[in-house]
């Protein structure tokens, strides 16, 4: 990979992680382009994934048996082709979808 792509991807990862923290989105430790978002309940992960897909974002839910019960998560895959504005749109959509899914969960 060309150095400018690596540098851009590193900036996008840092931007995503910082923005997620600012929005209260719980991330698992990862310095790679794969950013796991801890959700917990499988239904909540699936509902959030579907809400994001309806908004044009492909963020798959990773559920048992791939991960232990109660440890469902979302899988964000960043690439150097993404722009910061797209990462911001994703973060806003994530925060909104998570809030909506949590409301319907109760």
Indicate where each model-derived feature is located.
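Conserved PLP-dependent catalytic core of the aminotransferase class-I/II
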Residues: 1-58
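PLP-dependent enzyme catalytic core of the Aspartate aminotransferase-like
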Residues: 54-58, 65-106
